[in-house]
């Protein structure tokens, strides 16, 4: 059945008509026949005397999860998801197509919040206490999805397929009667005198606009311009968005020959000129991968997230300092090199090197090349000063960062609606009643490892809970009012 929106203004018009509506938008007049939202699901029978409408902008993780939660609490609430592309598109490609649902090692709120470069202070309150990683894993398990936690804490479906997560969410939203409208985009939003929202919804083909009055509006459109524009129209400010979670381009032609080498544990430090404050998180320890253009891997991605804003101001220029033997003191590195020299004095330096460092031959030759020690040089001819230089190179190898490259498994942005303008215990706007936000449209971003999806699940759940409770309360008030009449 189609959603009953008889008391809402919903009309089709060409986009140019938007500018002529002015403030008289409580009910738009059209010469065309009024049209209702069509539903791709089959909603439960509605209580037409107390119908209210929730429009969710964006059918990503936060939007779908929030819609499900709201509809679960308030079955009589009409819930419509508006998505300009495919629903749950980022879920499909994340984690190499496996979907990194959350992180199972950081379940305590204080520890969990520290994984959010933007939000680590604000999220230490009720946000994750209301719906954290354990709650997320329980929800999916209760809905038939088997999950597994890998050694690094990342949680994936046992199927190793993001389709399992997508099918679960879409099946539940359909079962509840959530309507999904694709190939449409909400392009205008304004409050009405009656406390509702007049939304202009552009259809992708042909180019025309529908208008609808919504009782509740949840903006969960990710890091695209659409959500920022709607938030601005409704009185919110926007922190300028910049990329987060990216790899480093390095100015070193010889590094390309090392592409594919992985270092299991490296201490990586990012130095940025004229940085006015100390950022402890600009030093990270973890795996590092050499790419054709520079460096990637978990340690690099964490650096990029914590340095996202300052790097954007420098044009993504800085110095990357890598310690390839983080568990070995510099004096011990010197000692190991000296012992190796004494033991293998007659062997070529390029062919023989200490196994204690866990290095591969290609990288060892790279280190020697930077010290000018390649060729037929024997260990016996290596001076003490040269050994010290090699030791320092292993512990303090600097690279010039000249730019960034997108990390294809993540599409994360720092910036968005400031958290100071949102009540995090409800996700409701402090500026506009009945307006809610969830997900990456907010100025929240996490490091790699399932943290960005957890932000989406938590925010969507809290927003959906708040909307559902308000809708139920409104229905009870209306029922009581009718009873008194």
Regions found by a protein language model. Give the residues of each.
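Beta1/beta-strand and adjacent pyrophosphate-binding region of the FAD-binding site
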Residues: 44-62, 80
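Core beta-strand elements of the Rossmann-like FAD/NAD(P) dinucleotide-binding domain
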Residues: 50-52, 205-216, 283-284
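Glycine-rich FAD pyrophosphate-binding loop
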Residues: 55, 71-96
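Short hydrophobic core segments
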Residues: 55-57, 186, 210-224, 231-232, ...
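Conserved N-terminal/central alpha/beta ligand/cofactor-binding core
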Residues: 84, 89-176, 184
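Residue-level recognition of phosphate/Mg2+-coordinating polar/acidic sites
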Residues: 107-112, 129, 134-138, 142-153, ...
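A conserved short coil-to-beta-strand element within the FAD-binding core of flavoproteins
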Residues: 182-197
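A conserved FAD-binding loop/helix module that cradles the flavin
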Residues: 216, 220-234, 443-477
């Amino acid at each position: 059945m189609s959603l009953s929106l008889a008391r809402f203004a919903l009309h089709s018009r060409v986009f140019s008509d938007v500018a002529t509506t002015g403030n008289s938008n409580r009910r738009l007049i059209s010469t065309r026949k009024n049209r209702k939202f069509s539903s791709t699901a089959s909603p439960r029978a509605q209580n037409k005397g107390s119908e209210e409408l929730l429009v969710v902008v964006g059918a990503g993780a936060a939007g779908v999860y929030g819609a499900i939660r709201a509809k679960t609490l308030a079955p009589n609430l009409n819930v419509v998801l508006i998505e300009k592309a495919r629903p749950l598109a980022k879920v499909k490609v994340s984690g190499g197509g496996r979907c990194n649902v959350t992180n199972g090692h950081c379940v305590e709120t204080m520890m969990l919040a520290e994984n959010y470069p933007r939000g680590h202070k604000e999220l230490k309150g009720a946000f994750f206490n209301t719906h954290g990683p354990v709650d997320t894993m329980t929800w999916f398990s209760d809905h038939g999805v088997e999950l597994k936690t890998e050694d690094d804490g990342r949680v994936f479906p046992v199927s190793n397929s993001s389709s399992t997560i997508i099918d679960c969410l879409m099946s539940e939203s359909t079962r509840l009667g959530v309507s999904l409208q694709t190939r449409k985009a909400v392009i205008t939003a304004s409050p009405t005198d009656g406390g509702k929202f007049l939304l202009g919804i552009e259809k992708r083909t042909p180019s025309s606009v529908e208008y609808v009055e919504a009782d509740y509006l949840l903006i969960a459109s990710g890091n695209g311009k659409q959500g920022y524009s709607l938030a601005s129209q409704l009185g919110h400010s926007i922190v300028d968005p910049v990329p987060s979670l990216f790899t480093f381009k390095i100015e070193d032609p010889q590094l390309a020959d090392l592409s594919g080498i992985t270092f299991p544990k490296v201490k990586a430090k990012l130095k940025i000129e004229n940085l006015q404050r100390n950022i402890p998180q600009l030093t990270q320890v973890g795996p590092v991968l050499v790419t054709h253009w520079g460096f990637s891997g978990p340690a690099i991605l964490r650096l990029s997230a914590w340095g996202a804003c300052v790097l954007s101001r420098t044009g993504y220029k800085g110095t990357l300092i890598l310690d390839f033997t983080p568990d070995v003191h510099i004096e011990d590195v010197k000692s190991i090199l000296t012992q190796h020299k004494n033991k293998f004095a007659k062997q070529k330096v390029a062919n023989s090197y200490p196994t204690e460092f866990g290095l591969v031959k290609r990288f060892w030759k790279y280190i020697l090349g930077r010290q000018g020690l390649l060729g037929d040089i024997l260990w016996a001819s290596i001076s003490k000063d040269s050994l010290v230089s090699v030791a320092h190179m292993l512990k303090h190898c600097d690279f010039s960062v000249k730019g960034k490259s997108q990390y294809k498994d993540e599409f994360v942005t720092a910036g968005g609606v400031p958290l100071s303008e949102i009540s995090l215990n409800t996700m409701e706007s402090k500026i506009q009643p009945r307006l809610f936000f969830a997900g990456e449209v907010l100025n929240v971003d996490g490091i790699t490892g399932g943290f960005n999806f957890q932000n989406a699940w938590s925010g969507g759940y809290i927003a959906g809970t708040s909307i559902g409770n308000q809708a139920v309360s409104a229905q009870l008030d209306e029922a009581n009012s009718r009873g008194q009449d």
